[in-house]
Amino acid sequence: MPVSRFAVFGHPIAHSLSPRIHTEFGRQMGVALDYLAFDVAPDAFRVSLEHFVAEGGYGANVTLPLKEAAFEVCTTLSARARRAGAVNTLSRVDGVWHGENTDGIGLVRNLTERHGLDLRGRRALLLGAGGAARGVAPALLDAGITEMVIVNRSPERADMLCDALGEPGRVSARYWGDLGDLGNFELIVNATSIGNTSDMRTFSLPRSLLDSMTVAVDLNYGSAAVPFLAWAHAVETRYAIDGLGMLVEQAAESFSLWHGRRPDTDPVYTVLHSEYGVPGRS
């Protein structure tokens, strides 16, 4: 019986833990699979997918900066992916690509089930409006966030995300320069790649964003999460959480879509957190 082929596409991709996570899930569930990583620039993504299919590829995860490009290659989309305008999970169904987005449910599961947080009634600040932000925003709203303010260095993209979410009474877009005038938030989510370019000694956000209950969450993990979480520690947010748990949970959702069974995430998370987790408070 041939081994099923899966992959993760991104640019860069060398840091990705997805091959290891899915291999561990397969071992746990008794599923034989081959999971590869492909470093692909956006302009080569569609052709790379065609080669992947020709070589027996069945499903793929998609990370930055390809999530919106993945949305465009899909013939069918889940309601979550359509609402997000971004895809992180591709499945080959009847000769075409079906797109799903498991980022949001992965984040919510990590925050509510692993860290015991209640998201209902919270005021949230979402930093970023790209593929990562698009993936998590709908799920945060569905989890009960009362108000979401989206801030992005390119205000046009923030406006586009607000329009896509379709909830003008709960979601608004503001300029990055307005951060000091927005009041405080119970949840601050970093969905930018600023951790890849910022020195942890210079990254900062206004203290006026905080109250005594503020939870700071970075969708990145490892070294990319250090600047944001270092700031969170310095200003003493109530909790500071990196994106490793979300990564494992969204991977489990993808695995379930492909194989019909959801693996136990705790053993995989525990091992990876001991190796890659950024020290935090939770």
Curated annotation (Swiss-Prot):
Gene3D superfamilies: Leucine Dehydrogenase, chain A, domain 1, NAD(P)-binding Rossmann-like Domain. The active site is at K67. Shikimate binds at S16, L17, S18, T63, N88, D103, Y221. SUPFAM superfamilies: Aminoacid dehydrogenase-like, N-terminal domain, NAD(P)-binding Rossmann-fold domains. GO terms for cellular component: cytosol. GO terms for molecular function: NADP binding; shikimate 3-dehydrogenase (NADP+) activity. GO terms for biological process: amino acid biosynthetic process; aromatic amino acid family biosynthetic process; chorismate biosynthetic process; shikimate metabolic process. Pfam families: SDH_C (PF18317), Shikimate_DH (PF01488), Shikimate_dh_N (PF08501). It is an enzyme of class 1 (oxidoreductase). It catalyses: shikimate + NADP(+) = 3-dehydroshikimate + NADPH + H(+). Keywords: Amino-acid biosynthesis, Aromatic amino acid biosynthesis, NADP, Oxidoreductase. NADP(+) binds at G128, A129, G130, G131, A132, L219, G243. Pathway: Metabolic intermediate biosynthesis; chorismate biosynthesis; chorismate from D-erythrose 4-phosphate and phosphoenolpyruvate: step 4/7. Involved in the biosynthesis of the chorismate, which leads to the biosynthesis of aromatic amino acids. Catalyzes the reversible NADPH linked reduction of 3-dehydroshikimate (DHSA) to yield shikimate (SA). Belongs to the shikimate dehydrogenase family. PANTHER family: BIFUNCTIONAL 3-DEHYDROQUINATE DEHYDRATASE_SHIKIMATE DEHYDROGENASE, CHLOROPLASTIC, SHIKIMATE DEHYDROGENASE. This is Shikimate dehydrogenase (NADP(+)). It comes from Xylella fastidiosa (strain M12).
